[in-house]
């Protein structure tokens, strides 16, 4: 006869040996408590990401009944006519111009490739047409970058970054009309190349742990911020004409008075701004992008 504990089950009866009870109460609990001490706590950035947004397609996965219906009904993943024409013409021609061996050897793309990217508004794919951009969807942008990457990873990154991270999208969402009218047309045609100064030397791209900071001051009757920062691995920084600089704003003297608040912000700095120095070009993984 099995020496165990009789418990109710959903269908019939089950016998659970006492050894399993002991194992659960001792070893498993001890291992769990140990893991809690060893594993790092969720950072502020991770907590913000976990709490952001709403439940979408992922909810059906955790419910055990995943379905693509929600995604198909919500997103139209087909290319528009303009995007398809661009893929079959401009992107196809660009791929024919790219010689990855030479790009890697010379650590740069040829001048005619740079000129073609600007003339055909590759840097303005996400910028609305009213500002001179192409007004492509996220899917269109993704398809363009994917095809370019089949010929040159460095060229793909060069095109991808201005259309994803940094001043372009931030200006469209949060910029003043004056800022949009000035910057967006220039960004669309590559007259100004942007870069996004987020990654720090000590904190990486964890924005919540960023040590770069700026103190609100008044100088000559003008309200401003004196910022101190050190950034690293900023793609396109060597050729950028404008920098989207991320830092923590501190207002110890309460000078903002309702016109702003403490926390993470982005400042637009033109190349040559007093105090802004772009250092030596780094060599991440021997990539040829700037």
Q: What residue spans do the PLM features occupy?
A:
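Flexible, small-/acidic-enriched active-site or ligand-binding loops
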Residues: 274-290
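Short, solvent-exposed loop/turn segments at the edges of secondary structure
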Residues: 162-166, 191, 207-209, 238-242, ...
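Short, solvent-exposed loop/turn elements at beta->coil junctions and helix N-caps
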Residues: 199-202, 233, 281-284
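A gly/ser-rich beta-alpha-beta helix-loop segment of oxidoreductase catalytic cores
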Residues: 195-216
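Amphipathic, small/basic residue-rich leader segments at the start of a protein or domain
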Residues: 4-162, 169-193, 205, 220-225
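A short core secondary-structure module
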Residues: 222-276
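Short helix/loop capping segments that flank catalytic or ligand/cofactor-binding pockets
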Residues: 50, 134-136, 182, 205-207, ...
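Short Pro/Gly-enriched beta-strand edge/turn motifs at strand-loop
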Residues: 192-198, 226-227, 275-278
């Amino acid at each position: 006869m099995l020496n165990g504990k009789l418990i109710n089950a959903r269908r019939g009866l089950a016998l659970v040996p006492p050894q399993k009870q002991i194992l659960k109460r001792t070893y498993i609990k001890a291992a769990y408590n140990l893991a809690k001490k060893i594993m790092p706590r969720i950072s502020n950035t991770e907590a913000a990401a976990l709490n952001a947004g709403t439940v979408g397609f992922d909810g059906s996965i955790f419910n055990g009944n995943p379905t693509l219906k929600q995604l198909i009904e919500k997103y139209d993943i087909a290319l528009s006519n303009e995007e398809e024409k661009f893929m079959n013409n401009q992107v196809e021609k660009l791929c024919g111009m790219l010689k990855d061996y030479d790009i890697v050897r010379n650590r740069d793309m040829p001048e005619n490739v740079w000129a073609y990217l600007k003339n055909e508004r590759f840097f303005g794919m996400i910028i609305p047409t009213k500002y001179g951009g192409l007004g492509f969807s996220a899917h269109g942008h993704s398809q363009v970058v994917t095809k370019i990457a089949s010929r040159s990873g460095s060229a793909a990154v060069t095109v991808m970054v201005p259309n994803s991270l940094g001043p372009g999208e931030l200006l469209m969402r949060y910029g003043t009309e004056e800022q949009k009218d000035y910057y967006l047309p220039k960004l669309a045609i590559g007259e100004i190349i942007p870069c996004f100064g987020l990654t720090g030397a000590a904190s990486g791209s964890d924005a919540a742990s960023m040590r770069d900071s700026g103190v609100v001051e008044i100088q000559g009757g003008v309200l401003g911020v004196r910022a101190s920062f050190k950034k690293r691995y900023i793609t396109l920084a060597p050729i950028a004409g404008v920098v989207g600089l991320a830092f923590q704003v501190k207002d110890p003297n309460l000078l903002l008075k309702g016109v702003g608040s403490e926390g993470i912000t982005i400042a637009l700095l033109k190349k040559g701004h007093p105090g802004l120095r772009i250092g030596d070009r780094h060599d991440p993984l021997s990539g040829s992008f700037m």
